[in-house]
Amino acid sequence: MKQINLIYYSVFFLWYLLSLLPLRFLYFISDLLFYPLYYCIRYRRKIIRNNLSNSFPEKDLKEIVQIEKQFYSFFCDYIVETLKLFSISKKQLMRRMTFEGLDEIVENMNKKNKDFCFIYLGHYCNWEWIASLPYWISKDISCGQIYHPLYNQAFDKLFLRLRNQFGGECIPMKTTLRRI
């Protein structure tokens, strides 16, 4: 447990310091990160290329590689945006993100005056930012996000802290049906 806490606090401190950098500079870091991640480390490159080839059988290799590079660019942005969550203000987050149609959904739910379950899919854009949904809706409505616990306990603790900071509740995937 001491080792988990040591890793947790060390990584938290480092990531928090990085999160204090302006987002514009973090995006610059993201652009730099792309090259070693794609060309040197080749993080999961075979899996990604195989998945893209299976998803787009009509595309030739040149087009697949282009999509692959776009994914890596997106992935690097995801990394720095996730870091930024350690220090981003509510105002700054709300300026950078919107939920379209949310007012109508909340209004309909309030009219019916019944219990409801609002499901949203998080694997689009930066799904860590989507955990901020409670900022946009009434405080009377509780929010939760389903998550898969990470294998590394220190990182699991770190990401739970990150995801819970907006007022939502993280629901482990295995307990979803019982919890909802």
Tell where the protein language model's regions lie, with residue ranges:
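Catalytic core of membrane glycerolipid acyltransferases/transacylases, capturing the structured
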Residues: 115-175
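Membrane-proximal helical "anchor" segments flanking the first transmembrane region
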Residues: 1-118, 125-126
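Short, intrinsically disordered, charge-balanced linker/junction segments flanking boundaries
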Residues: 176-180
